[in-house]
Amino acid sequence: MKTRLIMLSLLAAANLAHADMLGKMNSRKPGRYVPETAWQEQVLPLPAYPTTAQWLELDTPVTVKPRVFIDSNSLLLAEDRTVRFTLRQLSSSGIDNISLEGLHCGQRTQRSFAFADTVGQRWITSSRPEWRKLDSNNATVLTVIKALCPEDAPPLSAEELANNLKQAAKRR
């Protein structure tokens, strides 16, 4: 037992010494390793309320109850590499739920920027400004991310984003 404890202590000390040595090596060679800068969200104003939307219905699995649409006019690949779009969910009873959404494909996070007041035709800013991890139990969200960010890869251009949406749109 004592031997194991001594060996464990020696391994821990060696690990700390190695970490210290790596820190010194990096500081002696400037530019050898540049830490990645933290992601910074691009702040954009809310777009105009979608009065002339071009709704494309997504092909959804049978487990998704509402019909799901994305306004192709609202698609935006922001400089911060997030995808912004207007989402419309239409219930079986005909009730519209429209929101301005964002996806950070590489991080698998989402954000709701605003919700539509369909009577007053205006946006109401979301009270939850944080980016949240995608809910793997939410079939609607998974359908949207699969449509806009196939294979969880962020689109490289606005054209690629538009093509992703067209390919995911329901064929009628």
Please identify what each model-predicted range represents.
Residues L10-A12:
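Short, linear, compositionally biased motifs with a strong N-terminal bias
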Residues D20-R172:
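N-terminal secretory-pathway/extracellular module detecting exported/lumenal segments
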Residues A14-L16:
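N-terminal signal peptide c-region/cleavage motif recognized by signal peptidases
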Residues K2-L8:
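Sec-dependent signal peptide recognition
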